[in-house]
Amino acid sequence: MDTVLKPLGVKCSGVFLDLGISSPQFDDGSRGFRPEQDGPLDLRFDITQGVPASDFLKKVNRDELVRILHEYGETTDPVAARRIADAVCLAVAEDRLPSTTKAFASLVASAKGKEYQAMHPAKLTFQALRIHLNQEFDEMRRGMRAAAEVMMDGGRLGVLTVSLCFLGLRPLSRIFQSRASDDTSCREPPHTHNRGGNNDPHNT
């Protein structure tokens, strides 16, 4: 938006952002998004940018991995995050870190233990790594800032978050609230609604 519309001096009365996840990408086993599908452990939306998850895990330190799993994995149990991080770091040290999704999911399942098996044991780990590798929340913030720059006074910004995990609604709500408090033209309070519920359906 800022590279196309802004130089043209175009102002929009409304902008709609679809933050939903691409089902074709998730359904493609070669992209490594689903723990139950076998494929390379990649987890990138744009395979021309950054490094695959298998390479990232070989370089990240334990404390940073614990933070990523805890912050982006929608878990309030720090013990689970530490168990997974320890298992990954040990596998890296012993040169046996899996490079495929199913094998990595098995490693995560073994680390978490049976008491954590209410859902697919690797679901939240895959989600956390995906969010971090793709900088999903940073991209969301950049998109909303760019939209605000091209909107005219009193313009409306709509955001569809059908597939956005629950924790993504927090920064989204803060951005809306910040815009509402800074912009006197906002006559209505911002509303956020996630039709997808609290879980990311693409990782089930």
Question: Where in this protein do the model-derived segments appear?
Answer:
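S-adenosyl-L-methionine-dependent methyltransferase catalytic core, i.e., the SAM/SAH-binding region
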Residues: M1-T204
